[in-house]
Amino acid sequence: MDNEETIKLDQFLKLMCVVQTGGEAKMLIQNGDVRVNGSVEVRRGRKLVMGDRITTMGENYVVEEAE
């Protein structure tokens, strides 16, 4: 993923196996249980870029380049 590429927050949560479905991602995000770069994020369509830090359910994730 270069600096121009993005992934939506709900897609990222599914990719990282935090949730199994888009509906689960929606609920987690809308409940305020997801932080992006330290701030609560309630938009499931939030575009993430390389280096963004996501925290949810006691776990930390970083958006990194796809292999």
Language model features with spans:
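A basic, amphipathic helix-loop patch mediating RNA/tRNA/ribosome contacts
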Residues: 4-50
